[in-house]
Amino acid sequence: SMAYITKRGNSYSVRYTYQDEHGKSYDKWESFPTKEEATNRKKQIEHELAAGTFLIPSTVTVGEFLMDWLPKQCSKHKWAPKTYQSNLALIQNLIIPYIGEMQMQKLRPYHIEALYDTLSKTPCGQYVGGKRRDLSPKQQKRTLSGTTLHEVHQLLHNSFLLAVEWGI
């Protein structure tokens, strides 16, 4: 089993695939500020995977989990490209900027409530392609619709049900 290093912006990511106790495969990304740290981690992962001593990371973040979940859902339900894109946009623009760095294990219902509360006051188009935009005072008055908030709710509900199944 191999691990790969990718430069992402100012950091280096180690990408690898591991299997849980049920033989299910997961892709995992871990980020490091330097190439040296990433290289050391890559060697460690490959050694552990080969030796069978690899411990399944329980530090999966909301962002990592959702970006792992999305393509799997897409192929499972044979989504149209448009469905995939709209779900990706929800994740990148309305979820990751707010709770993406949180560990799944530490996420509690009140974090989700706080997210909905924040989103209900968030202007449309505050994030596009996962990047924050400067909005004019007029644009800032247009908040997200109830429909959009409901879509975020559905997506989180469906994906988190799966997280329970996956034992995250």
Q: Where are each of the predicted segments found?
A:
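Short, intrinsically disordered, charge-balanced linker/junction segments flanking boundaries
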Residues: S1, A163-I168
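Short, Lys/Arg-enriched alpha-helical recognition elements, typified by the DNA-recognition helix
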Residues: S58-V164
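A short, charged, amphipathic alpha-helix used as a generic interaction element across diverse proteins
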Residues: P33-L49
